[in-house]
């Protein structure tokens, strides 16, 4: 029974087709590269500004579109992509996997999340894009703007968490729903950053693309490492 449970949590168990994963990685890198190039050359400035201003009262840029409860909801939803919640949920998930002695899934989750967070920080230092100055910020910020860490790490985290969780679910339709739900949560988080005035839309687009690409790359790495381990085990058995 325990072996069956471990197989369900193996990152390589029922993985998406490799061609699909490679296509997603390539597409994500392309979207990020094009977005970064456009940002560097100022080609996104007009659209970024138009979207930000469209979400604010024309007569008072400090007032976001919608009633007060909607503004409060956006502030609470954006916290789902903040490090306090992500680190807490990650720690609890890793603890559960450790208690199950499923080190492969735990390592997959830990490396994927920590690597994605590190990549986001490095890119922020490299681009050093200023935060939006058109509207009042409705959330505190401490780093530069491009790419959005909330969008990137949120996308990576919830997709990776869903990838681990679906190992328990036998029905394909339910697995698809869980992955789609994770994707939707990440979209809401990124959108809330623009609504709150703390990110340009192009920051969020770049973050989303990197999050999807990094999650897919982690799946590919898990597959190839698992296959190499299987080849070594098979070679060892053939020699005995």
Please state what every model-predicted region is:
Residues 2-9, 16, 95-103, 161-170, ...:
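Structural signal for the C-terminal ends of transmembrane alpha-helices
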């Amino acid at each position: 029974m325990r072996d069956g449970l471990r197989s369900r949590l193996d990152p390589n168990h029922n993985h998406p087709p490799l061609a699909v994963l490679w296509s997603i990685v390539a597409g994500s890198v392309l979207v990020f590269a094009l977005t970064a190039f456009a940002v560097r050359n100022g080609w996104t400035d007009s659209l970024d500004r138009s979207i930000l201003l469209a979400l604010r009262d024309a007569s008072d840029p400090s007032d976001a579109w919608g009633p007060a409860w909607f503004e409060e909801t956006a502030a609470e939803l954006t916290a789902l992509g903040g490090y306090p919640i992500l680190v807490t949920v990650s720690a609890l998930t890793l603890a559960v996997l450790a208690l199950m002695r499923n080190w492969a899934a735990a390592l997959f989750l830990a490396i994927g999340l920590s690597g994605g967070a590190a990549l986001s920080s490095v890119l922020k230092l490299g681009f050093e894009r200023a935060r939006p100055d058109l509207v009042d910020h409705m959330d505190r910020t401490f780093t530069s703007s491009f790419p959005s860490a909330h969008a990137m790490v949120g996308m990576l985290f919830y997709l990776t968490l869903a990838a681990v969780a679906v190992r328990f679910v036998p029905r394909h339709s339910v697995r698809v729903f869980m992955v789609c739900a994770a994707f939707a949560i990440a979209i809401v988080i990124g959108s809330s950053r623009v609504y709150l005035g703390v990110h340009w839309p192009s920051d969020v687009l770049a973050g989303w693309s990197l999050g999807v690409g990094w999650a897919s790359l982690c799946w590919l790495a898990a597959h190839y490492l698992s296959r190499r381990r299987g080849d070594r085990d098979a070679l060892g058995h053939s020699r005995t």
